[in-house]
Amino acid sequence: MVAPGCSVPGLWVRGFGQCLGSLFTLFSKPLCSAAAAASQPLDAQRLAERLRAQKQQQKTKEPAPTNPVQRRVRELVRFTEQLQRVHPNVLAKALSRGIVHQDKELVVINKPYGLPVHGGPGVKLCISDVLPVLAKILHGPKAKPLHLCHRLDKETTGVMVLAWEKEVAHQVQELFRTRQVTKKYWAITVRVPVPEAGVVDIPIVEKEAQGQQHHHKMTLSPSYRMDDGKMVRVRSSRNAQLAVTQYQVLSSSLSAALLELQPITGIKHQLRVHMSFGLDCPILGDHKYSDWNRLAPQKLSAGILKKLGLQQSKARHLPLHLHACQLTLPALQPQKEELTLLCRPPRYFVNSLRRLGLKMPSRDHSADEEAAQPGAQ
């Protein structure tokens, strides 16, 4: 409580690392008596503005990292934050610059990192919000909105298919549902799987993790277990879903590998769960599935941290290295041929490959080419 005309430069807010008030400053002003302080309400708006300004000043005072990797990680974090704050027109224009295919039926974009496909709690802007604007950019002001044909996780980059007509979108969705679409992903994993090629065929179910932080995760629900050297069938959860993933190591070093993943089924977080819990090779930057009991930044070995030029305390900003690199659609009409769509990985993905000593196959993508579409990070 402060009397009119009394400035309180020492006011600070306690709670969440900020301060609530300085009594010494409050009583050091002769005009700021206790009676006057009790008579007027505090201007909450001015206090909030002051706190925001102080917080912004603290951010600007933080020294810029000299390490190029840490600098790029910070830039990526800021880029994803900006994606949630930009005007829908700006986001739609950025997506239009990342188009990899367009015809009378479909539009295919290279989805950037950190952008959700659908809305939800805490989501300020998503791809579905800007589809009407994107359609107008491509086909003029009278264009009807584009339609989503499938989804990718917020942290996953790469091929994403949109349709001009709702009927075509339903047709493509049915192709996904009946597993007629061939999907290929690239993933950088922590450690190298053994064997280097194979199939992970383990059902997946969602469960609550009983740790310090109660949360839900997808996890394995095996149909068999080993008992005295023998494989014994077990009763699986009624909620478990069939999940099958083909994988192959494309390049490897002592501590990491580049994998090509081909999901045969399409279960939520299937690739992340199979890599982490099935092969014990979590995807680089997967802070959710690197540990079952905790929600914590991924813990990396000293060797990987050294190659990436990161400290463990900064690992929480490391993005998920999972990229939808290729998608093959069957012919939508009898007179047409199947459509194979390719997307180059984002810049941070290519940089991590180089630092970890991993090679990107030249038959699909050239490492010497520009790593990302215009506007992608």
From Swiss-Prot:
One Pfam family this sequence matches: PseudoU_synth_2
Chain residue ranges for the region called Disordered: 51-70
Annotated GO MF terms: RNA binding; tRNA pseudouridine synthase activity
Active-site residue numbers: 153
EC number(s) stated in the UniProt entry for this protein: 5.4.99.-
Catalytic activity line of the entry: uridine in 5S rRNA = pseudouridine in 5S rRNA; a uridine in tRNA = a pseudouridine in tRNA; a uridine in mRNA = a pseudouridine in mRNA
Keywords: Cytoplasm, Isomerase, Mitochondrion, mRNA processing, mRNA splicing, Nucleus, rRNA processing, Transit peptide, tRNA processing
Any one annotated GO CC term: nucleus
Cellular compartments annotated: Mitochondrion matrix; Nucleus; Cytoplasm
Protein name: Pseudouridylate synthase RPUSD4, mitochondrial
Lineage: Eukaryota, Metazoa, Chordata, Craniata, Vertebrata
